[in-house]
Amino acid sequence: MGLRIHFVVDPHGWCCMGLIVFVWLYNFFLIPKIVLFPHYEEGHIPGILIIIFYGIAMFCLVALVRASITDPGRLPENPKIPHGEREFWELCNKCNLMRPKRSHHCSRCGHCVRRMDHHCPWINNCVGEDNHWLFLQLCFYTELLTCYALMFSFCHYYYFLPLKKRNLDLFVVRHELAIMRLAAFMGITMLVGITGLFYTQLIGIITDTTSIEKMSNCCEEISRPRKPWQQTFSEVFGTRWKILWFIPFRRRQPLRVPYHFANHV
């Protein structure tokens, strides 16, 4: 199965994603420059903490890029419907194409997406069956990176010994306080937002319910048998190997269940 690149032409989405990239670049370059490397050179922290910071940052960036360009599960114009599954398909009243039940038509993208959770402007893409796992990784690594940066910002002023060597000729050193205050503001704002989003995503997977289904209150009308959380997460990530749930570099295998997901909207 070839790699399907999905690119949404949406200026609003570009602006939102550009803001996320700016915050990532701000932390990626300035936190090590102001905090990590100076304290490492004076023996206050081990080098492994710097490696961990860059590792988390790279995992976060890979998850962001892949979540934004991966096809979320767009349906082809002439899908081949297995004969035994025709009863689980329906006609979309917006694009007049057949789709599996639990699919949704995205008005911003202009097409139907399999098991669509929501359209996220922060990645300028829909979150659907084929990229939901990457969106979860993005939430996880963004929260981890934000906590890591905030922790070292706090330690820089209130825990670590004062730096003995400071090159005041450098712009980042002369304006360190303003830079760190902005980093703390962005970090706290990001942490609050991403924590709420990540929590709702986890609850949705555990209960096998998409965000669109929650908003439409359709779940109250459906007698949906509860699945074990391991099964629901395995369906999203495409593997039962839990260690692979944290790796954004791999290829996700298609779900080994029918297109329609037996419990549907």
From Swiss-Prot:
Example of a GO biological process term: protein targeting to membrane
UniProt domain DHHC: residue ranges: 90-140
Enzyme Commission number(s) of this protein: 2.3.1.225
Extracellular compartment segments: 38-44, 155-185
Enzyme class: transferase
Covalent S-S links between cysteines: none
Transmembrane helix as UniProt keyword: yes
Principal place of residence: Golgi
Chain ranges passing through the membrane: 17-37, 45-65, 134-154, 186-206
Cytoplasmic membrane side: 1-16, 66-133, 207-265
Catalytic residues, chain numbering: 120
Membrane topology: Multi-pass membrane protein
Location(s) in or outside the cell: Golgi apparatus membrane; Golgi apparatus, cis-Golgi network membrane; Cell membrane
Free-text domain note: The DHHC domain is required for palmitoyltransferase activity.
Family statement: Belongs to the DHHC palmitoyltransferase family.
Name of the molecule in the record: Palmitoyltransferase ZDHHC21
Species name: Bos taurus (Bovine)
Native organism taxonomy: Eukaryota, Metazoa, Chordata, Craniata, Vertebrata
Protein encoded by which gene: ZDHHC21
